[in-house]
Amino acid sequence: MSERIHASLARMFDEHRLVFWYDTARDMREAFDSFVLDGVEKVEISGNEFGLKYRMLRQEPKQRFLIYKDGPEPVMAENWLLDLQLATVVFKADQAAIWMAELGLPAQFESVVREHTEFYRAKVRVDALKRFMQASDTQTQMRLRMLAVCAGAEGGLDTVIEALLGELAAGKDDALRLIERSGLTEMFWTQVGQAYGYRSDEPDFEDFAISLFQSAYARALAEDGPLNAEALLVFRRWKNNRHWAGAFEELSARYQDLLKIPADLLKRDFRTLVATDHFEEIDRHIIRQIVQAMSTQTVSAPEVLTWVRERRQSHWYPKYVDIYQAISFATEFQQAMAEANLGMTSPAEGVKRYVTSWYKLDQLYRKFIYHMQKSSHVSLLADLYDAVENRYTNSFVLAVNDAWQDQIAGLSEWKIPGFASQADFYRDQAAEYRRKDQKV
């Protein structure tokens, strides 16, 4: 205690020449007697007010004085040093006063300290508050900074909300309990109500979180939600912050069924959801609807490619990246099939067409199969797989095979002008390396 008193008094003397100290409980005499600070003279009020005033104002006008009274502060009418006291500062030696002195707070901030004493009991919290404080802070702003410290945040109310959402996702309530112990709960909910429109007779943070997800989803679809537009901005910033990705996914999964999102999606055209990613089920719904539309060929290739490109911004895109890529390659395959001319008038023309364009159909088909199998969500692509497989087999492989068969049926010699046979390729390109026993 004596060290903190010494530090608090030292800070006061950095800004004031005179410091008054009233020992109301008469239990600080030892602390006063032990106080020593270079350049500071200790004096005691004991019926000698006029003598002290003359000394401090006339005899030693530059000297710094600690003016101590062993007892309470007199009423104003009987305080003969009141004019000096009003022009300087009074040191109060109770714990709240020490905290105020440490923070350099003026008297009008006394309630900010005395109403929230639990907050100030930890030096780490007081030190954090010091870092955040601004000279222009109001009492409300000070309490908001205290909320940020309790939540481990470093900004305004929005960052407090983000931190508390993270704690909620982790199944913890340490910050909320500290806010309660610090006497900041009522102020917190008042601020939340004013900022985001949350109203409840019995406010609860999980209830607020559910309302936040519900409102963000509704407002993203141009509908009204229980919270205001400012809440949507906070939600978006939190959702898109990589630091909170895990917390967002946890709460999104927790509230998806609670808010009956899967049932709601069944009533919506997936085109209205392309820019929305508040729940994982949205991606699955969009994928199913695109696959169905592609399977029945009721959407154009440019439309599908645009939707897939827009979904790259989705929070869940990395999880479904192979499905989206499979859809893209299936779309390109179908588009290429629609534009392909699979006829040939000679074997040479058939080979030339394959190496210049038809090979892309094989390539797109194989990329579709690769990403579908890699996705681990094969069932989502089942209808599209059937459509692509049927078209690849019957409209491409079978068509090319029939046309090719017609051309080679009339050949007396298996040679195609301008293209080397396998035997010629080996002789011209590979045999030389084998003779030198080289690996290729």
Per-region residue spans from a language model:
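…; additionally, a secondary subgroup of soluble metalloenzymes is captured
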Residues: 1-437
